[in-house]
Amino acid sequence: MDIEALKKHAKNIRTNIIKEVSNANSGHPGGSLGAADILTVLYFEVMDFTKENAGSMDRDRFVLSKGHASPLLYAILAEKGVIEEEELLTFRKLNTRLQGHPDLNELDGIDMSTGSLGQGVSAAVGMALANRLDHNDHRIYTLIGDGEAEEGQVWEAAMAAGHYKLDNLCAIIDENGLQIDGRTEDVIGPAPFEEKFRAFGWHVISVDGHDYTALKAAFDEAKTVKGMPTCIVAKTVKGKGVSFMENQAGWHGKAPNAEQTAIALKDLQEGEEVWQRLHVKRMVKK
């Protein structure tokens, strides 16, 4: 595993997240930035996923259950070469393929249309069960927000996965402790996740969601588990990489203005030349 290469991918992905949301003047940057390291490791070190097999069912599949983090998924697809980087600037525009929430009918590499929180987990369970019935050895991964876990459907799906002993399923909890209304513990407080998933018959691993080595080890361990699904509880920082967004619930679903965008790009060590490279011109009043 080349840590420096992964860091470069993650930096590119975070930069593109900022470009998408800023250019659209809409979107969800906080959770997208926070989960970038998780998906960087997953897509570049773990999953059987390439530009060539993106349109095939004969590969590992991923369900972004927290569908509002679509800027992250689109940035991943661009980094993998599935779509052109320039298309990211059509995010949330009229007639775009890059809608505010992922649509499997629009792009290869999107395995489930998501957005209504909690439903993606059930879809992932169904895919894993179908793979077993089809004698398909490919794995199913799903990313769940900690705020999303306030949805009862998450736990119904978790119970079903444990019952069917779906060892080809790996769920990742993006535990950043924040949601649109503030701290998750002040809203409903779905944590602690470890004890709850174990009670439903899951193998559970807790990791730092920004530690590439720990993430890779967790995904590798999940592949060895037999007779039960795996839940990776990844502790993350919402808005990771952008100084004024880190650990701020207010950046859950808000776009930065032009000045803030410049600061964010500088934080990501890319600078304004990235913005100019794609000839983006946008003036936003503070």
Protein language model regions, located:
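Structured core elements
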Residues: 63, 170, 206, 231-233
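Glycine-rich beta-alpha junction loops
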Residues: 68-69, 73, 176-177, 211, ...
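N-terminal capping segment at the start of a domain
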Residues: 9-26, 174-176
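Cofactor-binding active-site loop characterized by glycine-rich and histidine/acidic residues
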Residues: 17-21, 32-163
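Thiamine diphosphate
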Residues: 109, 113-116, 121-225
